[in-house]
């Protein structure tokens, strides 16, 4: 290990090691331990500043490959599924990535059940398999989605998307897969936690972000400053990072609230998903096990008491009644979680030395259950462009690269987001003309093969 001797401003000669090894292994977070480490780094930087040494070579390597430096190649604000997936894409690249997450480490290691089931396309499965995430999810908690049906109002007429025979040019026996959100988050963290080139700062709040022609800068709430060649916002559809970057967005408050829970039932769901646009409230059914279904109830926000005030037995009975006994007797078997519904799409997905991924770029209405697919796709597109640029010795934060990413992701995200909103506007409109049109749309979907094929392709990825 190299030693450097250099006079400090007060002319006292000191010896400083560039690398500091700490035992036992630590996970970096904004704790007192990190404060001490950061202080040591500041001493090193002060001592070596006259030598004009690059800040990125002054850092701390912890056991198990964790590396923390005041300078990284890429800073990612948000260690949710999109941020973690992006970091996993850069495994073995040599690029130093630092993720900044306000949640504690225990939440990343063991995310709590939040009621949300994610519908994954075949393309998303391919990405997750390549990144090593798929194999970390218990096989018995990956649920195939065979069929999908859409109902309208009080009618029993169904728009039916049957079990496919192929997807993405390969044989397939399902439209996609359903996996609990907390299982995806856990798998993503397990992959990233083993990467030598990735650091995760937990319990850490970002106060401010700045970008210039040469670098991006993140100022933490504790006063510390981190820099990088590129900054990514992956901190939810309500992203403060996006706002500070000056990237505007179209945000739509649907004025509705979604309740999610698991229910057992006496009749088989036949691995079929239902979207029931009934009058008054919408029910979505996502099949897990044959007699276990994730139940999503959506009501106008001013009517949430009509759900919240029900006992578990009353809620199960009301769902059974609304489904006309389609799944037999119902029983609530999980906690109930509720979320206000807000959609968002950014005007563009990049800024100066910065880009948006995941929900910070596009926050979909959960009616599609496909929000994570978009987030995963955004991470995949951007990571591939960055890896290509790095291999060619090009600037990974160049505006031309980031604009290319933005255009490519927008090409898919824009029509999906606005198309979903148009559908929701129609199927939550209960005027007489809208009710008539809703029925006609379902029939057109069943009897116009090109349209059905297009929607099926979207479902399968």
From Swiss-Prot:
It catalyses: a 2-(all-trans-polyprenyl)phenol + NADPH + O2 + H(+) = a 3-(all-trans-polyprenyl)benzene-1,2-diol + NADP(+) + H2O; a 5-methoxy-2-methyl-3-(all-trans-polyprenyl)benzene-1,4-diol + AH2 + O2 = a 3-demethylubiquinol + A + H2O. The keyword Flavoprotein applies. This is Ubiquinone hydroxylase UbiM. Belongs to the UbiH/COQ6 family. GO terms for molecular function: 3-demethoxyubiquinol 3-hydroxylase activity; FAD binding. Catalyzes the hydroxylation of three positions of the aromatic ring during ubiquinone biosynthesis. It comes from Neisseria meningitidis serogroup C / serotype 2a (strain ATCC 700532 / DSM 15464 / FAM18). Its cofactor is FAD.
């Amino acid at each position: 290990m190299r030693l450097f001797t250099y006079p400090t401003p007060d002319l006292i000669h000191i010896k400083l090691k560039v690398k500091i090894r700490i035992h036992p292994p630590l996970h970096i977070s904004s704790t007192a331990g990190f404060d001490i480490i950061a202080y040591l780094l500041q001493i090193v930087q002060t001592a070596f500043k006259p030598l004009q040494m690059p800040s990125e070579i002054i850092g701390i390597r912890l056991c198990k490959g964790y590396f923390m430096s005041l300078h990284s190649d890429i800073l990612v604000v948000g260690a949710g599924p999109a941020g973690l997936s992006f970091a996993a894409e850069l495994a073995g690249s040599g690029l130093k990535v630092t993720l900044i997450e306000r949640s504690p480490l225990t939440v990343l290691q063991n995310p709590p059940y939040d009621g949300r089931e994610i519908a994954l396309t075949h393309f998303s499965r391919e990405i997750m398999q390549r990144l090593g995430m798929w194999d970390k999810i218990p096989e018995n908690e990956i649920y195939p989605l065979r069929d999908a049906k859409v109902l309208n109002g009080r009618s029993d007429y169904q728009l039916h998307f049957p079990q496919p025979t192929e997807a993405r040019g390969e044989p397939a026996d399902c439209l996609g897969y359903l996996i609990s959100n907390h299982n995806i988050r856990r798998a993503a963290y397990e992959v990233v936690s083993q990467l030598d080139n990735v650091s995760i700062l937990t319990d850490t709040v970002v106060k401010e972000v700045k970008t210039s022609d040469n670098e991006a800068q993140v100022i933490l709430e504790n006063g510390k400053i981190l820099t990088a060649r590129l900054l990514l916002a992956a901190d939810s559809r309500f992203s403060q990072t996006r706002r500070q970057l000056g990237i505007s967005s179209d945000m739509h408050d649907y004025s509705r609230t979604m309740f999610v829970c698991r229910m057992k039932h006496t009749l088989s769901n036949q691995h079929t998903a239902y979207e029931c646009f009934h009058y008054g409230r919408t029910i979505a059914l996502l099949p897990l096990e044959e007699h276990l279904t994730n139940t999503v109830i959506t009501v106008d926000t001013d009517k949430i008491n009509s759900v919240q005030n029900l006992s578990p037995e009353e809620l199960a009975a009301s769902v059974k009644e609304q489904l006309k006994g389609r799944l037999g007797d119902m029983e609530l078997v999980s906690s109930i979680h509720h979320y206000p519904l807000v959609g968002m799409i950014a005007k563009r997905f990049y800024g100066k030395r910065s880009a948006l991924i995941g929900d910070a770029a596009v926050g979909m209405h959960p009616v599609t259950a496909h929000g994570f697919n978009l987030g995963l796709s955004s991470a995949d597109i951007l990571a591939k462009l960055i890896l290509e640029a790095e291999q060619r010795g090009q600037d990974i934060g160049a505006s031309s690269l980031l604009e290319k990413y933005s255009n490519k992701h927008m090409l898919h995200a824009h029509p999906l987001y606005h198309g979903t909103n148009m559908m929701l506007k129609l199927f939550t409109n209960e005027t007489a003309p809208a009710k008539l049109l809703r029925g006609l749309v379902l029939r057109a979907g069943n009897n116009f093969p090109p349209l059905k094929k297009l929607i099926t392709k979207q479902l399968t990825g």
